[in-house]
Amino acid sequence: MWLLDLGNTRLKLARVGGDPRGRARDGAGPGEVIALAHDDADFDRSLRALLAEAARPLAAKGARDGSPPDDRADEAWLASVAPVGVRLRVESALDAAGLRVRHAKTQAECAGVRIAYADPARLGVDRFLGLLAARARGGDQLVVSFGSAVTVDLLDAGGRHHGGLIGIAASHARQALGERFPALDRGAGDARVAFAADTPDAVAAATHRQALGLVLAAWDDACAALGRPPAVLLGGGDALAYADTLARRLSAAVAVSDALVLDGLRRYADAMG
């Protein structure tokens, strides 16, 4: 079974093994995660080649040892927040590989999670799947994704989603400042400085701290709402840039997942059958 997380800039995909009854093996999460930038000129060719190459060992193994087929080996579960045109290109590649595409959609309740949104369609499927992944870890979780946007969601130990926040990523904040105020567009800076002595560092450090401040404020509100501190679960491409600082400032358990959406997608696939 293939799992595909199609985001605003990249496709992340992985395979998960199953048993002949069609469910993922106990405790099995995504396998090796492969990331492809979908604005790359070779994206379509690379994806098709990857899918074709992966299919050959499975066919050879079944022919060699007579092992029973995995009933879900030809399934491809797709979670997409990308533009429609990009999604259609991915679906075309999956279809060419003989895979059955199944789409993940936000549900009001799924796998022990009850979302706060009255209209499930309003909650991005990536955030929804992140909640499913967090639920599997147990306890209260503040789920933060540092991707094209910064999203924060609070999930309590009973599986209730308390809602969330959406903010601007540091890279987009820097870009917006440079476009609105050309004098601030002086190139890349060092986000690690405490107080900058030049414009590039000042912009880089401030935009980094804006995203950090969003999470710190959300943490305070989460503690007040729950009456206890939650664990913090980070995902997204920039998660590692914030993990150490958050662990130090919050004195809390901070975990980083490089496959947060894919892990939630695997749990969604099992729940939906």
Residue ranges, per PLM feature:
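Adenine-nucleotide phosphate-binding core of ATP-dependent small-molecule kinases
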Residues: 34, 191-231, 253-254
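Phosphate-binding/catalytic loop of phosphoryl-transfer enzymes
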Residues: 100-103, 108, 112-180, 209-218
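A polyampholytic, Gly/Pro-enriched intrinsically disordered region
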Residues: 120-130, 185-195, 273
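A short acidic, often aromatic-flanked loop/helix-cap motif at beta-alpha or helix-coil junctions
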Residues: 41-44, 108-112, 260-264
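Glycine-rich phosphate-binding/hydrolytic loop that grips phosphoryl groups
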Residues: 254-273
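Short glycine-aspartate micro-motif
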Residues: 1-5, 77, 141-145, 233
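Short glycine-rich, Thr/Ser-proximal phosphate-binding strand/loop in the N-terminal lobe
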Residues: 1-71, 160-186, 190-193
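Short beta-strand-loop/turn "lid" adjacent to the catalytic site in phosphate-handling enzymes
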Residues: 57-122, 158-162, 169, 200-201, ...
